[in-house]
Amino acid sequence: MQVNVDLKENSYKVFIDEFKELTIKGNVAIITNPKVGGLWLEFLLKNLKCDKKFIISVPDGEEYKNLNTIEQILEQLFSSKCDRKTTLIALGGGVISDMTGFAASIFERGIDFINFPTTLLAQVDASVGGKTGVNNKFGKNLIGSFHQPKAVFCESEFLNTLPPREFSAGVAEAIKMAVMFDKKFFEFFENSTLKSSDEIAKMVQTCVKIKADVVVKDEKETGIRAVLNYGHTFAHVIERITDYKEFLHGEAVSIGINMANNLALRLGFLSKNEVFKISETLKKFNLPTTFKIPNADEFYELFFMDKKTQNSKIKFILANSIGEFKICTDIPKDVVIATLKDFE
């Protein structure tokens, strides 16, 4: 299956279970980590035709998604005499995709890159849409750029080697899209165990279609694309205060979704039954839904480091009902604090 991301001169296709062989003019640098490289690098190299192939291996983990690692990638590209005709390939999950895209956007003012997402989270979300970047001490993804890939190859085979915890983390991002945009898709998660390859393929296809549609409408996140950050305003603070070590990104998003839903309940948007249904669906896929906040006031202040915060107004993405979103920039501080205190 193919999904077209129609962005005029930046258009590209997402290929789902269609990869056989890839021919690229010029040199190729594959960016991966030791774990993924050990599993899938040989498979990619065997089916890749180009001039020269370079392998750049970076440490595995969100804590390495920073400018230091980008500097290492750039140094290896320069020392290998790569140029503007070089194509980067991201072979890995969301961290690899984000860093490869960012490196491609700034190396000699921009070169091509292709995504081979090997995690469910990357296939349903991170690899599509051109958001690239790294974290710093002030927060997550605060340094980055919009740089669209030339193609994305989502192979179900990659998911066969994914640890169960990583798989569940990807499901959280998929449920996020269902709650925001598609009630029937949410019912799919209520009724599915995601044990069959057909169900998994259906989930990936639906998510890619939703993501592509949103990106086409709002490539640079000036409007509706911000809705894809549902759960993330809370999740990014959780990741930061736990130093990116306690939760996988999708797990933090799952907790963030539940926190956002409790805020929506307090504001009268969601019913108790809807909050319960979403929470139980997340739990069904072994995802966490709660986190003990050390201090509600300090947690609240960290919202201001979120990229969506503008003019000192925190932008909250909430569910108005399952399948319908609401963007709020004027929620009183005391209402948010009261919600956070429920998690203290």
From Swiss-Prot:
One of its GO terms (cellular component) is cytoplasm. NAD(+) binds at residues 60-65, 94-98, 118-119, 131, 140, 158-161. It is found in: Cytoplasm. The keyword NAD applies. Its EC number is 4.2.3.4. Zn(2+) binds at E173, H232, H249. Its cofactor is Co(2+); Zn(2+); NAD(+). Keywords: Amino-acid biosynthesis, Aromatic amino acid biosynthesis, Cobalt, Cytoplasm, Lyase, Metal-binding, NAD, Nucleotide-binding, Zinc. One of its GO terms (biological process) is aromatic amino acid family biosynthetic process. Binds 1 divalent metal cation per subunit. Can use either Co(2+) or Zn(2+). The keyword Secreted does not apply. InterPro entries: Dehydroquinate_synthase, DHQ_synth_AroB, DHQ_synth_fam, DHQS/DOIS_N, DHQS_C. GO terms for molecular function: 3-dehydroquinate synthase activity; metal ion binding; nucleotide binding. HAMAP family: DHQ_synthase. Belongs to the sugar phosphate cyclases superfamily. Dehydroquinate synthase family. This is 3-dehydroquinate synthase. It comes from Campylobacter hominis (strain ATCC BAA-381 / DSM 21671 / CCUG 45161 / LMG 19568 / NCTC 13146 / CH001A).
